[in-house]
Amino acid sequence: LVGSEMCIRDRYINIYGRSYLSDGKLKLDHTTNGVDLFFKGETLSVTLKASANSYMRVFIDDDTEGRRLAVSIGTKSYVVAQGLEAGNHKIRIVKITEMQDATWEVQSFSAEGFFAAPAKSELKLEFIGDSITAGYGVLGKQSDQKTIMNSDASKTYAYLTAQKMNADYSVIAWSGICTKAPLWGPGM
């Protein structure tokens, strides 16, 4: 168990997706990048810097649906779990907005205490794709224009497959840019 304020350390979090550490901060650019944390207490906060308004999905303990939480441009602290029973908890925070819409810099976490994360799955999956893989408009109607409000990468086949298989995963996806014939610009 470590103290109540935690900087980013691999030992205490499982990091998902292609991301990197820079000056003690975790850069989460791609859709479905995220972290698992194991903490003690009733409340957990995360401080992050977002390049634009975006969304996260927060899964607590064995919850599979999660809660959608809006993220505002700039640096802000977000209470991602509160009112939990006193004790040990697992939380997963997933960036569900596409890379071209927003990037994040996770700066710290705050709780009563943190525990070392268990080993990640030996099964590793990587998904490369376009809008279907990125969750483009997945919450909207077929006639709706894509927005960050109706897009959610945690509802895609890539994310759901990785969860069902209990796999470590990475998603490289960008709406409109596919591996063979992009709608605009160069392909992957």
What are these regions (language model features)?
Residues 53-64:
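Short, surface-exposed beta-strand/strand-loop-strand elements in extracellular ectodomains
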Residues 124-128, 133, 169-173:
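Structural recognition of the beta-strand scaffold that forms the well-ordered cores
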Residues 32, 99, 138-188:
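Conserved SGNH/GDSL esterase-like catalytic core that processes O-acyl groups on lipids
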Residues 44-46, 75-105:
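Short, well-structured beta-strand segments within conserved domains
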